Regions:
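Catalytic cores and adjacent flexible loops of soluble metabolic enzymes
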Residues: 1-221
Length: 221
């Protein structure tokens, strides 16, 4: 998938790092679309530190940047100190997690912050706290529905973010096509994040909200 993403023209590919006991309880309630608890699902699919280091090296060999989302201060430290990540991506669920946001900001790396499930006041509060520590940040508009109908993407917010924050603004797009992303670019978005799969019909929680290699290539072109 790394090679295909690179061949399709993507600038970067993003992974996740979980240190489960540092970020959630073992008895986290089970989601309706999961057959197991979130803890068990992530424990089964989680990548090791060695795998992350290998993936970063493999990305470099294939001319695509390695990005990663930490979900706790410990995973952020591992990414910074051991994996040697060059950029952080913080997911929407951690937007109001100011201890984590500030901890990452102090590392002074370029950081992309998603803003799903949040009010404008919450976005501004996090921006104010982070920007005074690290000015190398970007925000992405996001609607946390998987897959997300285009009518709920609210890409008009992109223009508001550009006007208010005067930093790079993008879209974390969970629709199952490329057209919402194209609209976001027309509104000034300079970052587009899409879930990526080899088969939209595959089993799993994310495939239906993803695009395949041919679509990614079309989006980039």
């Amino acid at each position: 998938m790394v090679k295909l993403a690179s061949q399709s023209g993507a600038s970067a590919i993003k992974f996740q790092m979980h240190v489960l006991d540092d970020e959630m309880l073992r008895k986290t309630p089970k989601s309706k679309n999961f057959s197991e608890s979130l803890y068990d699902a992530l424990n089964r699919t989680n990548l090791s530190i060695k795998q992350h280091i290998y993936l970063k090296k493999y990305c470099k060999q294939n001319n695509i940047d390695y990005l990663c989302t930490p979900f706790s201060r410990k995973s952020a430290d591992i990414l910074f100190n051991e994996v040697k990540v060059n950029i952080f991506k913080i997911g929407s669920g951690e937007l109001t997690n100011l201890p984590l946001q500030i901890h990452i900001a102090k590392k002074k790396l370029p950081t992309i912050i998603s803003t799903g499930m949040s009010t404008f006041r919450e976005v501004k509060e996090t921006f104010d706290q982070v920007y005074k520590i690290n000015k190398k940040i970007a925000l992405t508009q996001c609607t946390s529905i998987y897959p997300c109908p285009s009518k709920y993407s609210d890409i008009g917010v992109i223009k508001d973010y550009i006007k208010k924050f005067k930093i790079p603004i993008g879209l974390s797009d969970h629709t199952n096509s490329i057209y919402t992303s194209l609209g976001a670019i027309a509104l000034g978005a300079c970052i587009i994040e899409k879930h990526f799969t080899l088969n939209k019909k595959a089993k799993g929680p994310d495939h239906a909200s993803s695009i395949e290699p041919a679509e990614l290539k079309q989006l980039v072109e």
